[in-house]
Structures are given as structure tokens and as C-alpha cells.
Amino acid sequence: MPMLIQNARVIDPSQGLDKVMDLLLEDGKIAQLGSNLPAQNAQVVYGTGLVAAPGLVDMHVHLRDPGLTHKEDVYSGCRAAAAGGVTSLLAMPNTKPAMDSPETVRALLERAQTADAAVYTAA
């Protein structure tokens, strides 16, 4: 079912766009942007106070995975990131063991394959 988000702030730096408008979503993708779009057969969401923007990138994330997963792990960290609009993140190497070898990096990236955000690593 299509979804119409009315009166959300739409930000798209690539288009120089920053204004309140309606978004029509079809199959999970933006099909149309505009003002006063018709709601025909669409679920209506009132977007006042909401922001629609490209996914954000967090360049400094402590996933603590491996070794300190009682604080955070790939899945909880990515879930929290996605809830805040972050679609990509850079994981710091402060883990136990330290993420300082190809093996530990590969292991983290393998676990991240099914996470809610794209994970990259730093050293």
C-alpha cells in the first residue's frame, strides 16, 4: 500500500532542497515529492516535525564487538544507528582482542552483513 507523508521537512543536499513538503512512497521508495499531494489509496502519515533526508554517516562508533558485547554489539549498535537515521558507520578498533588484524576485521564485517546499517572499520 502506498504511504503519503504530509508536511515533512525534506532535505536533499544534492538537489539543494530543504523545505516542508509531501512525500509519496511506493514499494518503500520515494515516488513523488510535492505540495498537497492527493492521498488516493495511500496510508497517510502526518509528518509535521519529521525530517526526510539521505542516510547519515557516523564516523566514530564504538561497537565493542568482539570482547565487550555486554556494552554493545554489532546488532544493537546498528539498530540504534538506523533508528536515528544513520545508514553507515565507522567502527572504532577498541575491542578485545583489538581489531588490528585482517582476521578480526573480517570477523566483524561478516557479523555485520545482516545488521541494520553498513559497517566500515577504522584502525
What would you call each of these model-derived segments?
Residues 37-52:
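Active-site metal-binding motif and surrounding structural segment of the metallo-beta-lactamase
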Residues 12, 22, 46, 54, ...:
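Acidic active-site catalytic centers that drive phospho-/nucleotidyl reactions
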Residues 8, 23, 28, 49, ...:
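Divalent metal-coordination and catalytic microenvironments
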Residues 1-39:
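N-terminal metal-binding scaffold of metallo-dependent hydrolase/deaminase domains
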Residues 45-46, 91, 121:
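General beta-strand structural signal in soluble alpha/beta enzymes
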Residues 110-123:
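A glycine-rich helix N-cap at a beta->alpha junction
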Residues 50-113:
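Metal-associated gating/positioning segment near the N- to mid-region
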